[in-house]
Regions:
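Short, conserved beta-strand element in jelly-roll/cupin
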Residues: 51, 60-75
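A generic "binding-loop/recognition-motif" signal
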Residues: 52, 81, 97, 106-107
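Conserved short histidine dyad/triad with adjacent acidic residue
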Residues: 40-60, 94-95
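A short, N-terminal "cap"/entry segment at the start of jelly-roll beta-barrel domains
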Residues: 1-43
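Short acidic-glycine-tyrosine-enriched beta hairpin
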Residues: 79-95
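Conserved hydrophobic/aromatic beta-strand scaffold that supports enzyme active sites
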Residues: 46-48, 65, 90
């Protein structure tokens, strides 16, 4: 029992990893990602992710559940409607999703990814 069977998600749960989207995917700005990957079990990952303002192309090969904790973003599927996501919103992005993610206000999300 204990830490092996229960874990809080927080920015203190893991060492932060700072990265950026590949330059060829950046549409606007200079988005910087900070990821706290709290758990990795086989094909499952969970933690927290934060991004500064910017816009880049996304292409999902994995399934992801997200809950926006802070900030404001717009996710637009190629050929589809723009979806505004803000603190309190939860959603799933499925494999095959292609489009853009635009961070208007620094955004923090909880995530669970299955590859």
């Amino acid at each position: 029992m204990g830490e092996d069977t229960f874990r809080f998600l927080s920015r203190n749960a893991a060492a932060p990893v700072v990265s950026r989207p590949p330059p060829n995917r950046v549409v606007a700005g200079d988005p910087v990602f900070t990821t706290w990957n709290a758990e990795e079990r086989g094909n499952l990952y969970c933690g927290m992710w934060q991004c500064t303002p910017g816009k880049w192309r996304i292409q999902y090969e994995e399934w992801e559940y997200c809950r926006i904790v802070e900030g404001l973003s717009v996710i637009t599927e190629d050929g589809g409607a723009a979806r505004i996501v803000r603190a309190g919103d939860s959603f799933v992005i499925r494999p095959g999703f292609r489009g853009t993610w635009e961070v208007l206000e620094t955004t923090l999300k909880d995530y669970v990814v299955a590859t």
